[in-house]
């Protein structure tokens, strides 16, 4: 699930994805993409 959070690497997406109520994420095309629970 893409969220509107800019990133350079996947580690930056851990907290934004948690805050969005999801598990973890990767950085895809400069934006975070989270995995739903």
UniProtKB/Swiss-Prot annotation:
Changing residue 15 to A: Toxin selectivity change from Kv1.1/KCNA1 to Kv1.3/KCNA3 (no change in ability to inhibit Kv1.3/KCNA3, but important decrease in ability to inhibit Kv1.1/KCNA1, Kv1.2/KCNA2 and Kv1.6/KCNA6 channels); MeKTx13-3_AAAR. The keyword Glycoprotein does not apply. It is found in: Secreted. C-terminal amidation is not fundamental for activity. It permits a slightly higher activity on Kv1.1/KCNA1 potassium channels (native toxin IC(50)=1.9 nM), than non-amidated recombinant toxin (IC(50)=6.7 nM). Disulfide bonds join 7-27, 13-32, 17-34. Pfam families: Toxin_2 (PF00451). GO terms for molecular function: ion channel inhibitor activity; potassium channel regulator activity; toxin activity. One of its GO terms (cellular component) is extracellular region. The modification Lysine amide is found at residue 37. InterPro entries: Scorpion_toxin-like_sf, Scorpion_toxinS_K_inh. Keywords: Amidation, Disulfide bond, Ion channel impairing toxin, Potassium channel impairing toxin, Secreted, Toxin, Voltage-gated potassium channel impairing toxin. It comes from the Eukaryota. Changing residue 12 to A: Toxin selectivity change from Kv1.1/KCNA1 to Kv1.3/KCNA3 (no change in ability to inhibit Kv1.3/KCNA3, but important decrease in ability to inhibit Kv1.1/KCNA1, Kv1.2/KCNA2 and Kv1.6/KCNA6 channels); MeKTx13-3_AAAR. Its main location: secreted. Expressed by the venom gland. The keyword Iron does not apply. The primary structure of this mature peptide is identical to that of toxin alpha-KTx 3.6 from Mesobuthus martensii (AC Q9NII7). Has the structural arrangement of an alpha-helix connected to a beta-sheet by disulfide bonds (CSalpha/beta). Belongs to the short scorpion toxin superfamily. Potassium channel inhibitor family. Alpha-KTx 03 subfamily. Inhibits voltage-gated potassium channel rKv1.1/KCNA1 (IC(50)=1.9 nM). Also shows less potent inhibition on Kv1.2/KCNA2 (IC(50)=105.9 nM), Kv1.3/KCNA3 (IC(50)=8.9 nM), and Kv1.6/KCNA6 (IC(50)=63.4 nM). This is Potassium channel toxin alpha-KTx 3.19.
């Amino acid at each position: 699930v893409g969220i509107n959070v800019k990133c350079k690497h996947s580690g930056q997406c851990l907290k934004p994805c948690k805050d969005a109520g999801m598990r973890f994420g990767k950085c895809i095309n400069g934006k975070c993409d989270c995995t739903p629970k």
